[in-house]
């Protein structure tokens, strides 16, 4: 039985903030994001930051003479690539974000999905190799960290009960963490939200609309994974999930005040 609970400061739920994409290669973008995070935390809303680091993983794999393959938007992870992927995500990407947090005056703690029994993990699909699927398990470690006013920075690396290191899609990792702490989920990407066939921002979507846009190829690949993760949380927790851009970090402050930014993924209305 998962030990999940609502962790909040006052009336504000934890903001589970997923970052990744090109952000990790943009010092100014990271600086602005951490400045916004510092203000949100100072205003009484805790943040858990979850990250991927696909661009860095691709670079490191190429440097080691390895190729990247994706299946339906998810990275195929053969055993021989695990040391490179774990090093890029749990190592370099995690500490790059932590360095930006420290520079912005945010006290943070670098961790992975494997820490303190917060998640259970298993292989998602043998076709994907060592790609993990995680379920919320125990929130007590995160509860302690947040009670100190610290910001967890969580890499999307998990470990199974068999001791296998697993690469978890960061959007799916953020989904599990939002469920674990009953938090509000914000998925940041390189674009401003979900765009229609003409490149215009769609302000709100539910499952039926997502299915239609997926069928005609407007939502595909990485955005498809992101939207499906958002729908999972929206429907299981009965609350909207935001998909927005890290390029407009100040919008997060507006979001913490209850305003809408990017695309809202809505629970299906019965």
UniProtKB/Swiss-Prot annotation:
The keyword Cytoplasm applies. It catalyses: N-acetyl-L-glutamate + ATP = N-acetyl-L-glutamyl 5-phosphate + ADP. It is found in: Cytoplasm. Substrate binds at residues 53-54, 75, 167. InterPro entries: AceGlu_kinase-like_sf, AcgluKinase_fam, ArgB, Asp/Glu/Uridylate_kinase. GO terms for biological process: arginine biosynthetic process via ornithine; L-arginine biosynthetic process. GO terms for molecular function: acetylglutamate kinase activity; ATP binding. The keyword Membrane does not apply. Keywords: Amino-acid biosynthesis, Arginine biosynthesis, ATP-binding, Cytoplasm, Kinase, Nucleotide-binding, Transferase. Its EC number is 2.7.2.8. The record marks 18, 226 as: Transition state stabilizer. GO terms for cellular component: cytoplasm. Pfam families: AA_kinase (PF00696). Pathway: Amino-acid biosynthesis; L-arginine biosynthesis; N(2)-acetyl-L-ornithine from L-glutamate: step 2/4. Belongs to the acetylglutamate kinase family. ArgB subfamily. HAMAP family: ArgB (MF_00082). Catalyzes the ATP-dependent phosphorylation of N-acetyl-L-glutamate. This is Acetylglutamate kinase. It comes from Shewanella halifaxensis (strain HAW-EB4).
